[in-house]
């Protein structure tokens, strides 16, 4: 008895001694567990400072790069159908429990452990699922780790219930859910899949979205339409089971198909979307590998950019203090760009006004009479089938389903079935809702004319405006930074620059006759004359030749200097694309990007200096510390005198030649120089023009070269591209961004004759514009 008492005393002694330490250890454990729990304010309003800001030259925010496309809504903005579907499916006792559903846990435990029925799920309430956002579960934590995680979720769920109403918890939950397709939160999901606000969702639409909550890929109606339909109908059944709708209504609604208006909303809206996309591409660029390039010139150009341009691949070149790479979507960077907000707005408006109000309507009228519209009448069936097949395989519909493992024949069969869809249109809404087959939608989109436009400031090289296409939401391809097209007569100023550099002058005279060459295969090649018959055989000046875009005069100059010298001059002035050194180069047989062409032309108003385009001046971290500052590289490409001679030559194009519409139709009075360009079959229309203050280039054409206007009356560069330039310049002048009083700076000692009056044949005021014979033919 005495020993038993002694043992009891000893036991309690050690309990009393160790209890404080055990309690302290437990408290320390709790502190460790919950020290990093975000506050409720952070849960309800996640910190947005970590979104990267892209800032215009005047301080305006163009956009933010962020990891989640999320817009928060209030409970009042939720459809009752959505509330009912969520509660019925995810947590039927949501209004009754206090964060943890004890009855639900017991039910799951009994059926899962005793009856081995794993279909009962994990018994998590909506509140617990919200708590999971605080503690994302990691793989490989083990059973003990999962116990701790579950404990955290339970405690946080109870804490949430004590501090928020049920309505607040429900809306926070719906704001936190990821629905796939870059849609975070219920508003983004509603807009992405149905183009509606959450308050507008019908029963079947709400059920579709709620069905995606736990497995957004498996039940995605775009990727897995059959599974999505089955899951949606399950949710509708749950709504009937929990008395939110009647059984009769449920059975009726289940018969309704899923009618999507699917449109991913990730960074599509806002100003300068093509520019922002180009910025992201360049900052994420990896070190160039030769195997990824067809031409050595392109590889060399990107390799030099990697070496000399810190912005190119910036995210792969720069590290945080801890050694990690910066993340464009969540590190709160501030990127200061050279884009001018008003110039950019004016550029996008100019594109919309010309293409939307005029050119596209004219093209649509032509297409009504084409058997194979939008393809030209001479396009054979094999070519048409190839272009359509390529388009199908590049479509989201095809790629998403192939990625999900759907057999190719099943996917292709869908392209002949009519479905509801939303397609781009030049109207106030920017789209139309219609019913057509996916094949017809491909033809619809191919019928839309594409464009590209970029404006670069002389001397600084700053990019001020950048439009990569007609509408970024529907046409992601960037025709400025990614595309290369045949350049037509816009190539001719490089040949004339070579002539001026070699000692010729604008008033030098030549006889206007066709020129023949021995082609590489030994045959004769004669560039087709684009001049009126009465002009042939006349003595003309070089200035007349460029003003009227005469192929005969360009061919004459090519004979004097050769294709190698011309290609070298183009590379010196900033063209880095591959150039075939052939005689046809003199009339535009080269594919070059718009940005290259504009940057090369920019050497002329920059007094002969080539300046690499610059579009970011500095990058700061989230605290305002400067991480990088950027300057461009400059080099003398041509002599200052040569540049001034070329300005004089190219002013003739605008004053009397194929660019004269800038004066007559748009009333522009300041000093302007430029060149139009049109390629074979009117596939490409160009205009690149510059003033003392800005150099701007515009290209317009079809997605494929086989899509074009029938004649030069509508398909010339002076009709397709030049009007965008004219509209944009008028808007910028009205905004006070430029002045018509600006003048090109002449060299200190001008000792050459620029007055060629009396040395040329007489032409109309608008010269070759009236003759409509600007088209460049490579072979006759």
PLM features per residue range, with description:
Residues 124-126, 143, 197, 205-208, ...:
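Extracytoplasmic/periplasmic proteins that interact with beta-lactams or build/remodel peptidoglycan
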């Amino acid at each position: 008895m005495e020993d038993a008492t002694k043992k009891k005393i000893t036991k309690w002694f050690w309990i009393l001694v160790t209890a404080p330490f055990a309690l302290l250890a437990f408290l320390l454990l709790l502190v460790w567990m919950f020290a990093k729990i975000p506050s409720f304010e952070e849960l309800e309003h996640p910190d947005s400072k970590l979104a990267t800001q892209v800032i215009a030259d005047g301080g305006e925010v163009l956009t933010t790069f962020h990891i989640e496309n999320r817009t928060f809504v209030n409970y009042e903005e939720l459809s009752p159908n959505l509330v009912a579907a969520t509660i019925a499916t995810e947590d039927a006792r949501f209004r009754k429990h206090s964060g943890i559903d004890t009855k639900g846990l017991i039910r799951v435990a009994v059926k899962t452990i005793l009856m081995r029925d794993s279909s009962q799920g994990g018994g998590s309430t909506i509140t617990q699922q919200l708590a999971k956002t605080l503690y994302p579960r990691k793989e490989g934590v083990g059973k003990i780790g999962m116990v701790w995680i579950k404990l955290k979720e339970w405690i946080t769920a109870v804490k949430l219930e004590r501090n928020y109403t049920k309505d607040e918890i429900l809306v926070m939950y719906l704001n936190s859910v990821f629905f796939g397709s870059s849609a975070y939160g219920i508003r983004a999901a509603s807009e992405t899949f149905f183009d509606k606000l959450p308050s507008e969702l019908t029963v079947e639409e709400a059920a579709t979205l709620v069905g995606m909550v736990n497995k957004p890929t498996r039940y995605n109606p775009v990727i897995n339409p059959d599974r999505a339909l089955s899951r949606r109908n399950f949710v509708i059944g749950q709504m009937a089971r929990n008395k939110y709708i009647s059984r009769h209504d449920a059975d009726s609604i289940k018969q309704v198909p899923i009618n999507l208006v699917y449109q991913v909303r990730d960074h599509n809206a806002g100003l300068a979307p093509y520019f922002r996309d180009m910025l992201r591409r360049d900052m994420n660029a990896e070190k160039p590998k030769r195997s990824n390039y067809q031409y050595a010139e392109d590889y060399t150009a990107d390799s030099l950019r990697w070496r000399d341009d810190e912005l190119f691949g910036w995210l792969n070149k720069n590290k945080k203090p801890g050694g990690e790479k910066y993340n464009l979507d969540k590190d709160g960077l501030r990127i200061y760009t050279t884009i001018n907000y008003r110039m950019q707005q004016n550029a996008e408006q100019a594109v919309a006004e010309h293409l939307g109000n005029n050119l596209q309507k004219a093209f649509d009228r032509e297409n009504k009479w084409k058997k194979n519209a939008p393809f030209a009448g001479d396009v054979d069936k094999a070519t048409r089938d190839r272009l359509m097949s390529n388009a199908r395989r590049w479509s989201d519909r095809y790629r998403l389903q192939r990625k999900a493992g759907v057999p190719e024949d099943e996917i292709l069969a869908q392209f002949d079935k009519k479905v509801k869809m939303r397609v781009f249109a030049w109207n106030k809404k920017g789209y139309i809702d219609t019913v057509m087959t996916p094949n017809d939608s491909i033809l619809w989109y191919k019928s839309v004319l594409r464009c590209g436009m970029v404006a670069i400031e002389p001397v600084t090289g700053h990019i001020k405006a950048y439009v990569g296409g007609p509408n970024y939401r529907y046409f992601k391809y960037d025709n400025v930074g990614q595309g290369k097209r045949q350049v037509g007569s816009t190539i001719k100023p490089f040949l004339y620059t070579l002539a001026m550099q070699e000692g010729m002058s604008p008033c030098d005279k030549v006889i206007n006759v066709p020129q023949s060459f021995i082609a590489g295969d030994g045959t004769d090649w004669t560039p087709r004359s684009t001049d009126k018959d009465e002009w042939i055989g006349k003595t003309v000046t070089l200035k007349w030749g460029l003003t009227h875009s005469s192929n005969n005069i360009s061919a004459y100059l090519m004979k004097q200097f050769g294709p190698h010298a011309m290609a070298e001059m183009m590379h010196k002035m900033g063209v880095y694309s591959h150039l075939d050194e052939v005689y046809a180069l003199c009339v535009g047989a080269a594919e070059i990007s718009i940005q290259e062409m504009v940057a090369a032309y920019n050497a002329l108003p920059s007094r002969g200096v080539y300046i690499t385009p610059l579009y970011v001046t500095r990058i700061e971290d989230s605290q305002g510390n400067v991480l990088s500052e950027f300057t461009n590289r400059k080099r003398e490409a041509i002599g200052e005198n040569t540049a001034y001679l070329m300005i004089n030559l190219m002013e003739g194009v605008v004053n009397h030649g194929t660019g004269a519409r800038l004066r007559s139709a748009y009333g522009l009075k300041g000093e302007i120089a430029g060149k139009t360009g049109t390629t074979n079959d009117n596939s490409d229309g160009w205009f690149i023009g510059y003033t003392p203050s800005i150099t701007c280039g515009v290209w317009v054409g079809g997605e494929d070269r086989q899509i074009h206007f029938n004649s030069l009356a509508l398909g010339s560069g002076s009709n397709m591209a030049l009007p965008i330039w004219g509209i944009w310049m008028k808007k910028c002048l009205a905004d006070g961004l430029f002045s018509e009083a600006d003048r090109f700076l002449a060299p200190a000692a001008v000792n050459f004759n620029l007055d060629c009056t009396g040395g040329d044949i007489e032409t109309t005021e608008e010269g070759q514009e009236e003759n409509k014979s600007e088209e460049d033919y490579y072979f006759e």
